[in-house]
Amino acid sequence: MADDAGLETPLCSEQFGSGEARGCRAAADGSLQWEVGGWRWWGLSRAFTVKPEGRDAGEVGASGAPSPPLSGLQAVFLPQGFPDSVSPDYLPYQLWDSVQAFASSLSGSLATQAVLLGIGVGNAKATVSAATATWLVKDSTGMLGRIVFAWWKGSKLDCNAKQWRLFADILNDVAMFLEIMAPVYPICFTMTVSTSNLAKCIVSVAGGATRAALTVHQARRNNMADVSAKDSSQETLVNLAGLLVSLLMLPLVSGCPGFSLGCFFFLTALHIYANYRAVRALVMETLNEGRLRLVLKHYLQRGEVLDPTAANRMEPLWTGFWPAPSLSLGVPLHRLVSSVFELQQLVEGHQESYLLCWDQSQNQVQVVLNQKAGPKTILRAATHGLMLGALQGDGPLPAELEELRNRVRAGPKKESWVVVKETHEVLDMLFPKFLKGLQDAGWKTEKHQLEVDEWRATWLLSPEKKVL
């Protein structure tokens, strides 16, 4: 009886990641008997025994224990600790990303075939020097484009990573279409392939940079290197599959340009659709201007804060990667004031670490940030600017803002700085509630993805100034 009781009483337990825990019981002979029924998915369906040290070497010992579950394809292609080590949107994004990569690989094979044909591969009249010159012009154009685009938009890619990711893949399709059409017009071949390579280099900058931003979002255990490495492994596997299919596809389409073009259009449609689904699956938990607009509008109209899932589902993807002209954060102070009187007007009523100038006629807001302005101050400044824009609209507003909007519309037109001062008082009541609602809904307010320039300023403030 005592032995039976010992066999039934768990001595300890263990689990791998978030998997099912297994218990360990004492067997009658003093060995440890581990349960493995919870690991049936890995092909284990019976208990195994670990013998004490010094027992019969012919019996099953510690070496007979099964290897940890993370020993198959999951270990090769998924980050360690999956799914707990990555964001909840990791799997749907990676699945659709693999589909788009496969379609892009096949389209790329068709484009490469067309470029080689245009350069003169298989043509006895083509010269090596002409082909080399074409290739050098194509590559040098792309290199210059890469540098210029990285300088022009590099600092803006974090703010709208999803939109730029989609833009990069669509531009890649355009580049491959140019390559396919290049041999049709031999006189413009060099210019066409150079333009195509320029577009592809822009794609490499935008796509690579936004992929890095998405890796930061997906990695939940400071495992960005692991997530990036496994993403590369997945992409390599997909490209290998695409290469094998291309070997079968190219002989079928090489003699029929119309069929080749039809295959390209089909693969392009699949590529764009899969990209859209992949980007739409992402749930970013930090606020950029587009998501802040959606969340603030919903809050002002209904008094509720949208959670990240709902806001990301509503976020526009086909637009949004160009900065909206209605809100500019981090502008230089000299752009807004040219006299002591204008500076006094701008500072009056501002007890926060920012100065806000509102152009009512064009509904444009420009914000000067103090040296001490932190993420929450910037978030408040952006909320303030978007709230001023809401005064120009016709939708429902909270009672405090509705009263202010009615006063602005009923009486003579007020100076912008007077309205800004009054909205500061309203925001003092609304913003703490809004900020708490954001945090309760799951938004990460300690950081943001708002587009902010590097200009900072200092000015004389009232003693009641608050620094967030």
Swiss-Prot record:
One of its GO terms (cellular component) is membrane. The chain crosses the membrane at residues 247-267. The modification Phosphothreonine is found at T49. It is found in: Membrane. It comes from the Eukaryota. It is a single-pass membrane protein. Its main location: membrane. Pfam families: UVB_sens_C (PF24160), UVB_sens_prot (PF04884). InterPro entries: RUS_fam, UVB_sens_C, UVB_sens_RUS_dom. The modification N-acetylalanine is found at A2. Keywords: Acetylation, Membrane, Phosphoprotein, Transmembrane, Transmembrane helix. Belongs to the RUS1 family. PANTHER family: RUS FAMILY MEMBER 1, RUS1 FAMILY PROTEIN C16ORF58. This is RUS family member 1. The lineage of its organism: Eukaryota, Metazoa, Chordata, Craniata, Vertebrata.
